[in-house]
A protein has these predicted regions:
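C-terminal regulatory/oligomerization modules of transcriptional regulators
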Residues: 1-14, 119, 130, 134-154
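Alpha-helical linker/hinge and terminal dimerization helices associated
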Residues: 28, 32-35, 39, 71, ...
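N-terminal helix-turn-helix DNA-binding core of bacterial DNA-binding proteins
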Residues: 15-19, 23-26, 30-77, 103
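Alpha-helical structural elements of signaling/regulatory helical domains
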Residues: 45, 62, 77, 116, ...
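Charged, amphipathic alpha-helical coiled-coil/dimerization segments
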Residues: 61, 83-145
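Short hydrophobic/aromatic-rich motifs at helix boundaries and adjacent loops
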Residues: 4-11, 21-24, 35-37, 54, ...
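DNA-binding alpha-helical recognition surfaces that contact promoter or target DNA
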Residues: 80
Length: 154
């Protein structure tokens, strides 16, 4: 049996559907991920893995906790993704001076795959700029940095 919906509830639901930042961000993230997935086809790397490898390469050896924070990933997601990269022989994980610390570096295979994927990333960036226009691309990239502020205020 279908419940009747009063106008207040209908208005609230329409407002949610039209303006929910979370829903819009998730939808946008899926669209961007599919876009980059197409450009990364044939690289043996997913865009998320590529991003992790870039973060490692820039600061290696990097403590796992620092990299996870830099990438904005929760511990569970980061650990799962890192496990796949380690299993595939792309990263090496060693103990730091403090036995509790784990340091991540790229293996030779990880560096090779990262290097091979960079042209695909460059193509994806250019395609995104062509699709959105340079100004919209820049505005979107800047706007996507803003949600990090949510975590600073908690």
């Amino acid at each position: 049996m279908k419940d009747a919906m009063d106008s207040r509830e209908r208005d609230a639901l329409r407002n949610i559907s039209a303006s929910c930042l979370c829903a819009k961000a998730r939808k946008a993230a899926r669209a961007v991920t599919r876009f980059y997935d197409r450009h990364f086809a044939g690289t043996d790397l997913e865009p998320g893995q590529f991003t992790i490898l870039v973060g490692i390469r820039l600061t290696e050896p990097v403590p796992t906790a620092r990299l996870a924070e830099h990438l904005g990933l929760d511990r569970t997601t980061f650990t799962r993704n890192l496990g796949v990269l380690e299993r595939d022989g792309l990263v090496a994980i060693e103990r730091g001076e403090d036995a509790r610390q784990r340091l991540i570096s790229l293996t030779a295979e990880g560096r090779r795959r990262l290097k091979a994927a960079i042209p695909r990333w460059e193509q994806a960036q250019q395609a995104a700029i062509s699709t959105l226009g340079k100004e919209n691309f820049s505005d979107l990239a800047a706007a996507l940095s803003l949600p990090a502020e949510f975590n600073k205020s908690e």
